[in-house]
Amino acid sequence: MRNNSKITTLEAKFPLLSIEQGCMVSKDADITVAFRVELPELFTVTSAEYEAMHSAWHKAIKVLPNYTIVHKQDWFIKERYQPKMAESGLSFLSRASNRHFNERPFLHHSVYLFLTKTNKQRMQRQSNFSSLCRGHLLPKEITDKEEVVKFMEAVDQFERIINDTEQIRLTRMKEEDLVGTAEKGGLLDRYFSLSEEGHASLEDIRLGADLVRIGDNRLCLHTLSDTDDLPTSVSTDTRYERLSTDRSDCRLSFAAPVGLLLPCNHIYNQYLFIEDSDDNLQRFEKQARNMHSLARYSRSNQINEEWIQEYLNVAHSQGWTAIRAHFLSLIHI
């Protein structure tokens, strides 16, 4: 019987070309700088501190150039607590605490941040795009040393702004942190095993119409793209009722329901696509004119025009930057 399944090697599909000076270079000539992120301890952040953290992220993102992708990735992996029982000098309470929590399950949280410099053509690429449609393979931005230098300077400024806060700490990942060493695996190893182990075995990856599987892990992807699934209002943090009282508030981040409150192995991804804001606003202006011309045929067109006009008025008066965003949660069972 003939096997019609398509089998290929990881080397042929691997999107990275090389790692140069601590930066990941893709086969499409995108440059990515990776960071390890340290966040405050859970349930210790106040509402004012959440606001300060949000302001720091906002300030840092605004220094990045156009056609930059900000990707924050939160890994939540189920583990069992392993205390260091053999440590000497522990007090009676410390030893009792270690025995109490020994082997208890918990979600291990690790955070990574990726800043990618791409180009306008890549940012707007669709599935029907072909390299035969352009006269050169490499984008001109990657061959312009000045553009690369400006991006790296913006990354340095981004890192300084975040590290100036008291709550967040960024650590730039080096080549050995990404690809690993003979003794310890790197970040790229985790994608092939979905494991925290130092040197996990390489697993087969199956991409099918009905499922995606890495080794024994079956993956389920959920995207936050439908407006009906989004809340009517947003904030930096929310009150966690289970640990709050009449006299005290326990605050969690607004995205906690798809993050640490999701009791399974999962990866929560947040993408921000920074494009030319002026071009985006002009596109909204054109869309508003189209809605106005079609308002006589449908009341929904009239309502959409009012919403677009309201956004444009606020964006122009307050200097807002129009970006695109995408959020998804990758659950593995």
Write out the residue ranges for each language-model feature.
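Extended, folded cores of ATP/NTP-driven motor/assembly subunits in large transport
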Residues: 1-331
